């Protein structure tokens, strides 16, 4: 029951009419409907929640003549259930009781007060603390795409204008949003496969004029020129949809979203989706985080530092000035050992970035304020530690940290040392902060002394030794007497409750005191909540400066982390060159060296203008893929300002890194392994430049031997002669080792192995020249292929090698395929291919026949 016919509402009970009306307004999400101490779900929502959460599916009587499927969950456990739902991309509308059941006529007044979606989370319990939580929107124009991302938990708002489908795919891979909004006519839904929280939105939400008005209102500006985005039409339409969606779900002001930036691909090294996946930067091929570059590099002290590090990894810089600024900061931290003390100081700051977002949304909890107080109190010490450092970038970050003595003093006066989780029951505001609150609390807290005195006095007056004075939330204050002595109670005792062995009474005096105490408790709680709300008003004027403090602290954390990683893992500072090239001495794979059970064999690489392509040969399991990946990872690490696992490295300017390593079927798109391989190869051949780093592994293996060899040869030749990209080209086609004889700038290197009897030892050391053999049969034996099959394979190999040897003298020398003449096109066929016969008149068709005759 998803679509509600309002004409049928009269058939239902008043409560179900209220529910169905609210459900109609939130038909595309689960509705948690508060009833007492439970959230209830009905109809299809109940069935879906039962399936997703493993809760019992029951029925609640009948309404409209039919049994009502129902599922419920306790309100105090709701956060755990919400976490499960948002993790699988499900959105939830939370409907609370806002009326008083005691005074309500008919159903208690209820209202949807909160909408929880995967991309709009700010609650600490629902977020992955070391991952950005991005909401994205994509809009397709006649040419290109507009893409926007917003992290509601930090306020970071970024847009990008993307020319091609491949660029959009790369951005989706880079940002990895948890929720994606797309327009009704979006034509590339295949790109969204694998993303959980997909939301189809009406076209009007992407309207350009509406989007501009929304953004101007949000930022409080007359135009968008100051952000440098005024001409980004498509991405502004996507940003407008995001803004509308966040306003609809958050239902409050969003002051922490106060700026928008444009992501320019020219500012960072371009990494396409295949490259990010193949290099396992922040996610391994199985979808986890283990054994990734981020897992090795991330020893940050704060969650916000960890998130920034991952953004840096996915956006390696191209500007050498910015890279060197980071390097200088890391070098100074390392040389002075300042990173050691900084790590502990930064760790105590916590996740200020997300705390500030919750404060801006007025959803911060008492412990958020306590953590902010602690962080602000640590600032003077942090500033003092940084005062001895002189690297320009560190000095700039120190200035952005700021100082907030007034705000720290305010929170010190206002919030108790160890506040409760929620403001709901009070106990958050410190004694002495407000005299009126202290007075009301005094009345309430004096109750225990009064009750002790009353109990002693009544025992003495009545002579009843079992008499006790107590309190519970349901019945309030009472005098309790055993049933055996209940006949001795005075006449002014009024029976309040009968238990199995006890009677409970109230007296006029106790009733009067109860009303006074409960009144004081209520007034104290109401005043405390009022003072709590005022704290937001007192802190929010410093929101922008506090956000700048959080960003600066996060960056200091990353730089300090780089220094610690360099010291711990033996990394060195790479040198940046203005000349194109990658030269690494004794380079190591940053991930493999950490997980390998044996000592890692370091290897060099030399690529420059006169040595642009290396044909890499060697046995399977010999380390070719590891070698190529380590070159790419070291290059990337150098461009984020990190030190690298090598004795030394000289890295020139890079515009793109491409990888064609490994492949599997793309079942969702109906593409075979070979089709995936060729698609990635085509992307490289179309987009690589002389400043690109290209890794090509086993091109052509998914088809016949001669087809594969021809494709591999042509691709290598094209990259070497037409593109001139710095290329590592691994292959088992030994014919390709002849390329260095035919063209300049191409060299052979190989990884060797030593064979002894029927065993093989991989050396993992890169040497100049081509490999002598592939050792395929030996590797097959290591894999456990039966001996009978191995022996048969050896016999067949001898036959094939003998046949090849006999044919050796008749072979035509291999020549450059690109040097062959272009095939001559038939003019008649060219003319015919350009004709649409449906558009021809009889006379035009006859004339065309004569022309084709002439051309042929």
Swiss-Prot record:
Disulfide bonds: none annotated. GO terms for molecular function: ATP binding; ATP-dependent DNA damage sensor activity; damaged DNA binding; mismatched DNA binding. Keywords: ATP-binding, DNA damage, DNA repair, DNA-binding, Nucleotide-binding. It holds the Pfam family MutS_IV. InterPro entries: DNA_mismatch_repair_MutS, DNA_mismatch_repair_MutS-lik_N, DNA_mismatch_repair_MutS/MSH, DNA_mismatch_repair_MutS_C, DNA_mismatch_repair_MutS_clamp, DNA_mismatch_repair_MutS_core, DNA_mismatch_repair_MutS_N, DNA_mismatch_repair_MutS_sf. ATP binds at residues 618-625. One of its GO terms (biological process) is mismatch repair. Belongs to the DNA mismatch repair MutS family. NCBIfam families: mutS1, PRK05399.1. This protein is involved in the repair of mismatches in DNA. It is possible that it carries out the mismatch recognition step. This protein has a weak ATPase activity. This is DNA mismatch repair protein MutS. It comes from Shewanella baltica (strain OS223).
